[in-house]
A protein has these predicted regions:
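Single conserved hydrophobic/aromatic residue that forms the stacking wall/gate
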Residues: 1-15
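Short acidic low-complexity segments
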Residues: 50-58
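A short, aliphatic-rich alpha-helical micro-motif
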Residues: 6, 59-60
Length: 183
């Protein structure tokens, strides 16, 4: 039964093709990362959206949702996501694949590094979606993060402040992993 479910899930993933990238960005950093990810995934410009524009109709257009946020203050979600999360919680995500990414500062905010990713995960984990793009914590320096579940990040953390030299490689590796999970 377990192998049958795995095979069915793999078949469903292969059928997924329409990807929407949604980001919440105050300073522009998360938007820049979103656009890099979209480019690597061959997502057209028209399928890249600010989280503040999220609607149920827009969610229905996509099989795969790539959601990006920055982390603010004491580990808070970026403002554009508050209404976006409400939309996502009401939407039918049971047949959607969700990949999360986020920007944070592992030096100045080491105890809340990329918590925004974890907040999105917590908000969406009971919606029936399937999360893809889990990332190993190896190679990251931080004290704590709610984005770490069972020893792994539930998405891709990016630190453009202290580790910007690693951003392109991290995106490349993550996107390659996403492509395998989607195809």
């Amino acid at each position: 039964l377990h192998s049958l479910r795995r095979r069915q899930r793999q078949m469903c993933i292969r059928d997924r093709s329409k990807i929407g990238v949604f980001y919440g960005s105050t300073t522009g950093t998360t938007e820049d990362v979103a656009r890099k990810i979209a480019e690597k995934l061959n997502v057209p410009q028209g399928d890249i959206h600010d989280a503040s524009t999220l609607t149920d109709a827009l969610v229905k257009e996509y099989d795969v949702l790539v959601l990006g946020t920055s982390t603010w203050g004491a580990g808070e979600l970026q403002d554009d996501w508050y209404d976006g999360v409400k939309v996502l919680k009401k939407a039918d995500l049971s047949h959607k694949f969700v990949a999360l990414f986020g920007c944070g500062d592992s030096d100045s905010y080491s105890d809340t590094f990329c918590d925004g990713i974890g907040i999105l995960y917590e908000d969406l984990k009971d919606t029936g979606c399937t999360f893809i793009g889990i990332t190993d914590t190896a190679g990251y320096t931080f004290d704590a993060s709610v984005a770490v579940v069972n020893g792994k990040f539930v998405g891709l953390p990016i630190d453009e402040v202290n580790e910007d030299s690693q951003t392109d490689q991290r995106i490349e590796q993550w996107v390659e992993g996403l492509k395998k999970e989607i195809n």
